[in-house]
Amino acid sequence: MVLGFSGGLDTSYCVKYLTDEKGYEVHSVIVNTGGFSESELAQIEKHAYTLGVKTHTTVNAVKTYYDNIIKYLIYGNVLKNNTYPLSVSAERLSQALHIAEHAKKLKAKAVVHGSTGAGNDQVRFDMIFNIMIPGIEIITPIRDMKLSREEEIAYLKSKGVEMNFEKAAYSINKGLWGTSVGGKETLQSKGLLPEEAWPTQVTKTGSEEVKLHFEKGELKKINDQAFDHPSEAIQYLQTIAGAYGLGRDIHIGDTIIGIKGRVGFEAAAPMVILKAHHALEKHVLTKWQLGWKDQLAQFYGNWLHEGQIMDPVMRDIEAYLESSQAHVTGDVFVQLLPYRFQVVGIESKFDLMSSKFGKYGEMNSGWTGDDVRGFSKIFGNQTGIYHNIKESNQ
């Protein structure tokens, strides 16, 4: 059987329980979506073999995660509830897809994940496994046995497992598109996370301007430095913007299973990229390109959050989003300051805010006053007819 492995308490329990108590042959796989260093991945692999897995595989999914998911979140300027860049929910889908592919490759008879019965991840993993590897047995020991953290620790200690059992004051989930932060403050409806809870501490003061270069909606350069892949640009921008404490917030959302949840997150690079990209779009896209794209992108983000990445409608929306980016090319200038940033402006050969076509609020040479009088009369003609008939029948 294949186990999606993170090296944490839940998946460590799964390995030991399934190998020692059930006698199963467990093949662990970790999908790196930007949250682990090489040394951390090596330590996780060592830990997996110590626990008793038959094989352990590390999948580097950073680039495919961007290509298949993040790219479209940027195209759509997607923020769940106008706040959250879907940092963890998008990441889980990439992980589930790769775990399913690994299970198919090994012709596994079962697939295992360490989700509890309380959150969104159980639905995302179960649903994608059911779609991609139909008929395979899905085993979820933590959920099915309703295990507490204390019970898991006691079991692993009884088996002589050595690992860090200290529960951190804050749960951290780091990835390419942001980091979630959970603690006692997020378990209630009021309260801010303290400074020490944030994984990236503020080390920069003053201000700094960065130039982001987009080509057809994708971030290709930062301050004229080119990158082989946009995921590398995201990681580089994170090192710059993260030190200003940018992209910190608390998201209140509706879970797939019907309860509301509150989670902190820091997403310096994602938030700067999304706002910069949106600013560029507002200059180069027409009114209704923006209007329809906003509607489709909102649905796309909501459906992605629900785990429905395999729905064919998502490919249809992605095709539209891709098409909309044909002219989203140019430079965006962003000023970074501690805890905030602002878009200074853009430069693009596709900028529709060209002075030769008129200046907002000023005189222009593109039309005459008589042209506007005629246009205004025709533009409101049907509404005028409606109100005329309405009044005559009262």
Task: For the regions a language model picked out, list residue spans one by one.
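Nucleotide-activated chemistry modules centered on ATP-dependent adenylation/adenylyltransferase
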Residues: 1-4, 9-394
